Amino acid sequence: MALLQIAEPGQSSAPHEHKRAAGIDLGTTNSLVASVRSGTADTLKDAQGRSLLPSIVNYANEEAIVGYAAKALSESQPQDTIISVKRLLGRSLTDIQTRYPSLPYRFKASENGLPVLQTTQGDKNPIEVSADILKVLAKRAEESLGGELSGVVITVPAYFDDAQRAGTKDAAKLAGLHVLRLLNEPTAAAIAYGLDSGQEGVIAVYDLGGGTFDISILRLSKGVFEVLATGGDSALGGDDFDHLLADFLAEQVGLETPLSAEKNRTLLNIATATKIAFSEQDSVEVEVFGWKGVVTREQFEELIRPLVKKTLMSCRRALKDADVEADEVLEVVMVGGSTRTLLVREMVGEFFGRTPLTNINPDEVVAIGAGIQADILAGNKPDSEMLLLDVIPLSLGIETMGGLVEKIIPRNTTIPVARAQEFTTFKDGQTAMSVHIVQGEREMVDDCRSLARFSLKGIPPMAAGAAHIRVTYQVDADGLLSVTAMEKSTGVQSEIQVKPSYGLSDDEVANMLRDSMTYAKEDMQARALAEQRVEADRVIEGLIAAMQADGDELLSEAEKATLLQAIESLIELRNGNEANAIEQGIKDTDKASQDFASRRMDKSIRAALAGQSIDTI
């Protein structure tokens, strides 16, 4: 007979209690929060019935002001009003000042070169600013859902690297939130769209937000969302449209540069309003700083056309990575407020040969997808068969002898993932090994991005090649990497979580992929040369060590001279640039030293058998 557990009222959790979870779209321009209520996912609104929260924080007073109230202060208090903070996450101060020279903020560098914003309220870093936005969204969710959140899913651009993802998680922690998962924005859109439509096949998600662009090629099949390939630009978005239009207006007005922070913000606000108006009308009358004139949609489209073309280049690369032709794409899902721009819809439609889907609110679809995923991860849908397969955007590898890159996890590998590979020592008696973690598609370390270094110490002294070091790369569901190196005979190990000090610039991401294709032939030639040089070094060092140990006993003077000549010839070839010549030199040296190697083997066997009888062998 089964025993029933009985608890005092209120002392145990109800087995079917619905946990409060929310999805947060932490956007560059606007942020949203969504949740599943009564089986339906929807965005949660503020007291005024607004879903969108401008991602703007004002620090002019003792308390942070977030959202629409902060936006209203952006012109009068530009240095204390932080806008588009997402662009600053995970970047160095040098990178920010180079890329965004006209930002009105007062910056200083932290000890490790990261940006600190100096405000009337005090110093703030991008993580703290992001946390203040998250706090407002969390409060909205808790008021709407009637209690404390058990966890949240926060969306990030697919191209966010480790530093930017870690910064997002740190901001959530600072806001007092438990992160169930970080979710790629295009994948979140696919969740919302896939569940609504029940479609199966290949779908392209074109996500153009305020500050980032992402393209994802996904395969939807029986509840499985598989990301075939991703691409994009971590610093291209609707904000750039605004800046181009603001610069155009400044020229029309005849303003001298550099502009004051106040004038710059005024121009940007007018540019944003004008851009939005072009979605409904062909021309807009603009009045600014005493200048009055008409700006046409055609003028605006000519300004932004090169940027839209740039997004289509990323689309082309993503299709190639996914091994999919444009005509195989069943639907194109438009995500992000910037996809309301008519030229964007027109050019994307021409590229894919079909009219993009715009029936889902492009501002809300990411948050809704995150809300659905949060509901599942919170345990509210235990019978859910939805499986999410994200991928890593750039290969992760390790440096080996000769400056070569050995790829451990190739790009577009589904995450979470763990891969291991064994390595060995290069020199006799080596007791430590340096592990250099790199990111990129090229064959040589100098052409890839360095992520981190750490050392494994305590390797037992052995002959070169005898030690076995197992290196494991593990990428979690949030795209964060941890690396472990372990010497197998002793179990000694060292571990690091990769959290670089700043993120990739927008051009670096695209260039890393482009260069891997442009220089593919040269890279393979460079790799072949480096591999032969490493092998030559091994042969040279091994032969010199053997001659020092047994040369006087086992070799005549003439034989010594022959081997030394072979070594000198190989050194000369090794310092050249012909891989085939080095390979032949290695073969010649091996052939010249074969008799010496046989004598050393005989000597070792005699020494091992000395003093033993037939019976004991």
Curated annotation (Swiss-Prot):
Region annotation (Disordered) ranges: 1-23
Keywords associated with the record: ATP-binding, Chaperone, Nucleotide-binding
PROSITE patterns (alphabetical): HSP70_1 (PS00297), HSP70_2 (PS00329)
A GO biological-process term: iron-sulfur cluster assembly
Function comment: Chaperone involved in the maturation of iron-sulfur cluster-containing proteins. Has a low intrinsic ATPase activity which is markedly stimulated by HscB.
UniProt record similarity statement: Belongs to the heat shock protein 70 family.
Identification of the protein by name: Chaperone protein HscA homolog
Organism encoding this protein: Vibrio vulnificus (strain YJ016)
